Amino acid sequence: MAHQKREATSDNGGGDEEWASKRPKVVGAAAEKEHILTSDASHETNGDEAQGGDASRKENTVSTNPCVSDEKAATNSNVSSGHGVILTSVEADAAEDKGCRHTMEDAWVLLPDASMESPGNLRCAHFAIYDGHGGRLAAEYAQKHLHQNVIAAGLPRELMDVKAAKKAIIEGFRRTDECLLQESTKGNWQDGATAVCVWVLGQTVVVANAGDAKAVLARSTSADGEGAVDDAKSQLKAIVLTREHKAIFPQERARIQKAGGSVGPNGRLQGRIEVSRALGDRQFKKVGLIATPDVHSFEVTRKDHFIILGCDGLWGVFGPGDAVEFVQNQLKETSSATLAVRRLVKEAVRERRCKDNCTAVLIVFKH
């Protein structure tokens, strides 16, 4: 069966939407029977330029249909609190802009039905950002293969098992990195990519990251969590779900030194690379850089409204609470994940002068 190719639809209403009016084609790139929405290096550029900058930029966003399921699974949680509630659907979208860089090295995945060739009773959705450095090849490789490897490693498909899910994700990262290093050796390229990934399995969210890309959860502060995200009275707090991995941090520095590497006065591994965990980067793998992710999970409750995934470019100009407040305001105004994530990236690049590639994925929970 050939890869499916679909034209993305638009909710354009003028104004902000003109900034990203050229919508990309959507290509199923990871497996023959996989319905996947991914970033695409061949997207068109709209010709807009940054104020005060010479580099042209692009922003692309692909709408997804909500993944609807009446899952009744309940699981253990190491993050969540509050009353359990059935999560009926997940709506997600992504936006990107290359900023003042000449190339876009980020890649992202929107996979509202992530069961692939392993269907089961458990809802499975997957979303990710791979922030490339030194090129785009490592990010694209992870985009195409990491989720496949996680599925193959035994991601639960019938009954939720948090321990098994975490084990499968860690093994999927290991296998992806192993194969990526083989490919990069054959191709004589040295790209790397940090990663932040989310799997929605039934009522449970599992988050994995390696490097400095982040995931931030917006959770209601009300006692009962009944307030909708677009309720003017609803107050949300930002919960960072990931831990950055940088060579300058004491725990990572100690691990690097134990592996025979060093951290320079500039806080970089071997004086060259800031992150201490990433996929690829074969020249640093023998001196302490690893691809092992941190993995955390929580059970979704009515208090949990949305998750923002972002590369380091986004978080360089947005604090977690600031980003949650911005997205909440956009959802109050438009009730559209597509417009909210698009405006988030636009704000980061156009108004806050993000110089790096900027990519965000917005995942909205429907209760």
Curated annotation (Swiss-Prot):
It comes from the Eukaryota. Mn(2+) 1 binds at residues 131-132. Its cofactor is Mg(2+); Mn(2+). Binds 2 magnesium or manganese ions per subunit. It is an enzyme of class 3 (hydrolase). The keyword Magnesium applies. Mn(2+) 2 binds at residues 131, 312, 356. It holds the Pfam family PP2C. InterPro entries: PP2C (IPR015655), PPM-type-like_dom_sf (IPR036457), PPM-type_phosphatase-like_dom (IPR001932). This is Probable protein phosphatase 2C 67. Belongs to the PP2C family. Residues 91-365 form the PPM-type phosphatase domain. Keywords: Hydrolase, Magnesium, Manganese, Metal-binding, Protein phosphatase. It catalyses: O-phospho-L-seryl-[protein] + H2O = L-seryl-[protein] + phosphate; O-phospho-L-threonyl-[protein] + H2O = L-threonyl-[protein] + phosphate. Its EC number is 3.1.3.16. Disulfide bonds: none annotated. One of its GO terms (molecular function) is metal ion binding. Residues 31-46 have a biased composition (Basic and acidic residues). Gene3D superfamilies: PPM-type phosphatase domain. CDD domains: PP2Cc. Residues 1-79 are annotated as: Disordered. GO terms for biological process: signal transduction. It comes from Oryza sativa subsp. japonica.
